């Protein structure tokens, strides 16, 4: 997958400034995953957020428009992912997608989980047998309309 030039520029500046997504999130009062999604062109910053990030990363102010314009979302390559970490999420959906769907629909009825009214958190859970990744997704349930 080829990354957009804006993504490359933001990631390079973040690395040069030795900042984490958490650092940048704290600066603008946003979650680290949201900031990462902004860097990858999947979120829209307010003008104030864009200005703060540009200043922290020592970038030019002309990037404010790029960061605050709604992007085309979900534009990853339409093939099975090859990055090992991203592939595991694909694999998780292959194995657990239908079971998750059934459990969600047993609890909520016929509908979907919003990816718009949505948040995601990633945490590290220390474990003597090997650290664990905890991913929490929270999306509004949207029932299908009957007519």
From Swiss-Prot:
<feature type="active site">
    <location>
        <position position="91"/>
    </location>
</feature>
<keyword id="KW-0456">Lyase</keyword>
<dbReference type="GO" id="GO:0003677">
    <property type="term" value="F:DNA binding"/>
</dbReference>
<dbReference type="Pfam" id="PF02560">
    <property type="entry name" value="Cyanate_lyase"/>
</dbReference>
<protein>
    <recommendedName>
        <fullName>Cyanate hydratase</fullName>
        <ecNumber>4.2.1.104</ecNumber>
    </recommendedName>
</protein>
<dbReference type="Pfam" id="PF21291">
    <property type="entry name" value="CYNS_N"/>
</dbReference>
<dbReference type="InterPro" id="IPR010982">
    <property type="entry name" value="Lambda_DNA-bd_dom_sf"/>
</dbReference>
<dbReference type="GO" id="GO:0008824">
    <property type="term" value="F:cyanate hydratase activity"/>
</dbReference>
<feature type="active site">
    <location>
        <position position="88"/>
    </location>
</feature>
<dbReference type="InterPro" id="IPR048564">
    <property type="entry name" value="CYNS_N"/>
</dbReference>
<feature type="active site">
    <location>
        <position position="114"/>
    </location>
</feature>
<comment type="function">
    <text>Catalyzes the reaction of cyanate with bicarbonate to produce ammonia and carbon dioxide.</text>
</comment>
<dbReference type="InterPro" id="IPR003712">
    <property type="entry name" value="Cyanate_lyase_C"/>
</dbReference>
<dbReference type="InterPro" id="IPR008076">
    <property type="entry name" value="Cyanase"/>
</dbReference>
<comment type="similarity">
    <text>Belongs to the cyanase family.</text>
</comment>
<dbReference type="InterPro" id="IPR036581">
    <property type="entry name" value="Cyanate_lyase_C_sf"/>
</dbReference>
<dbReference type="GO" id="GO:0009439">
    <property type="term" value="P:cyanate metabolic process"/>
</dbReference>
